[in-house]
Regions:
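Sec-dependent N-terminal signal peptides
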Residues: 4-13
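Sec/Tat signal peptide C-region and signal peptidase I cleavage site
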Residues: 15-21
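Electrostatic cytochrome c docking/interface patches
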Residues: 22-49
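Soluble non-cytosolic domains of exported or imported proteins
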Residues: 40, 44, 48, 78, ...
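Gly/Gly-Pro-rich "capping" loops immediately C-terminal to redox-active cysteine motifs
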Residues: 47, 59-95
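The canonical Cys-X-X-Cys-His
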Residues: 51-61, 107-111
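C-terminal capping alpha-helices of c-type cytochrome domains
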Residues: 97-120
Length: 120
């Protein structure tokens, strides 16, 4: 009886696996960032743009934590698609952001992708 149960559990675990859909993260603290390997090729230009533009004002750690927890680390407000859009508009209006509408749109799409992947 025990052998049958053990065999059944082994087969079940062998056939069924849990897929981790979350975006991988590298580093800790101020060096924390999304792993470029876990980002689809179509999103890589937006990711590269985010790596250059967003770190002018804050570390990527802030963005990673917001995506992982669903909470903006500074304000404590929900970090969802609506908030991402609002942050995009806010960044567009900042005089030193050096970002245009297309760049903001690309980064908003990327952040929404991260939110979707993290929710899986």
């Amino acid at each position: 009886m025990n052998k049958i149960l053990l065999f059944s559990v082994f087969i079940g675990l062998s056939v069924c696996s849990i897929a981790e859909a979350r975006i991988r993260v590298t580093g800790r603290g101020a060096k924390m960032n999304f792993s470029a390997d876990s980002i689809p090729d179509i999103q890589k230009p937006a990711f590269d743009l985010m790596q250059v533009k967003c770190i002018k004002c804050h570390t990527m750690e802030r963005t990673v934590i917001a995506i992982q927890t669903g909470v903006a680390p500074i304000t404590g407000q929900p970090f969802n698609k609506q908030a991402v859009k609002a942050y995009g508009i806010k960044m567009l209006r900042k005089p030193n952001s050096d970002m245009d509408k297309k760049e903001i749109r690309d980064i908003v799409v990327l952040l929404n992708y991260f939110l979707d992947e993290n929710a899986k």
